[in-house]
Regions:
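N-terminal cap/leader regions of alpha/beta-hydrolase-fold enzymes
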Residues: 1-261
Length: 261
């Protein structure tokens, strides 16, 4: 796949491999991609959307690797099995979505914040020992449910996360006692969120609550609503895809990484 416009320094070739990561709760299958040449690169931990580790995410991770980064995409649903944990069509249209989520919902609920952050520690330790990853802090980015995981990871491991981003995230600032936004006071990273417009999983009151939490905590951040873009706008294998919003996401993510590393 050719590099996208505005990706910054372009690497001519990347190498993607499937890797296994040991955790306290078993083995995680993951995708690692990095530039073929140039030695160790700054590392990015990439949190999947609910549809999981699949060709679209590998394609996106490869694009980020071509911009000069080592990217790790773990299957966060590993407790249910190796990816894909449910059968997916090549293209997920609006009609297929409800049934896929019906099958995924128990697995999503089973990934508690405690389990997810225990896993995050394993991912970060693995990257610290990975020869393709430069030493020092990493960046984290997440999509859909992964946006909340990115935010939580920045709060749980402030000494390891220098930048955190989330795109078309949902339920980021709820009334729950373990809502993701409540970690804001522990974050030292720079944070960016690109919210979907008219997203039922992230209504305006949650956007305002998240903004207030980050501001009150003194977190360097920017939160933007992508007008007209629906939930899932970065995923070209779904009916939610919005090319203009996706390219805006790339510009924002690459800008954040350029400021960080």
């Amino acid at each position: 796949v050719s590099p996208g416009e505005g990706d910054g320094p372009v690497v001519t070739a990347v190498r993607g491999t499937d890797v296994d990561i040991r955790t306290e709760d078993g083995t995680v299958d993951a995708y690692l991609t990095r530039p073929v040449e140039g030695g160790a690169r700054p590392a990015v931990l990439w949190y999947m959307d609910a549809y999981g580790l699949r060709p679209r995410l590998r394609e996106m991770a490869d694009r980020l690797a071509r911009a000069g980064y080592t990217v790790l995409v773990p299957n966060v649903f590993h407790r249910r099995g190796r990816a894909p944990v449910v059968e997916l069509p090549e293209f997920i249209d609006a009609g297929a979505r409800p049934e896929i989520f019906r099958r995924l919902r128990p697995t999503m609920r089973a990934l508690t914040p405690e389990r997810a952050m225990r896993d995050a520690g394993a991912y970060l330790r693995w990257l610290a020992e990975c020869p393709a990853a430069a030493g020092g802090p990493v960046a984290v980015t997440g999509y859909c449910m992964g946006a909340a995981l990115a935010l939580r990871t920045a709060g749980a491991y402030p000494d390891r996360v220098a930048a955190a981003a989330g795109f078309h995230g949902g339920r980021l600032a709820t009334d729950a006692p373990d809502s993701p936004h409540l970690v804001a006071g522990r974050i030292t990273a720079e944070v960016y969120f690109g919210h979907a417009d008219r997203d039922r999983s992230l209504p305006p009151e949650q956007i305002e609550r998240l903004e207030r939490a980050l501001t009150d905590a003194g977190v360097r951040h920017r939160c933007e609503v992508y007008a007209g873009a629906g939930h899932g706008y970065t995923q070209s294998d779904t009916a939610a895809y919005d090319k203009e919003a996706d390219e805006r996401h790339w510009a924002a993510l690459l800008g954040l990484l350029a400021r960080t590393f």
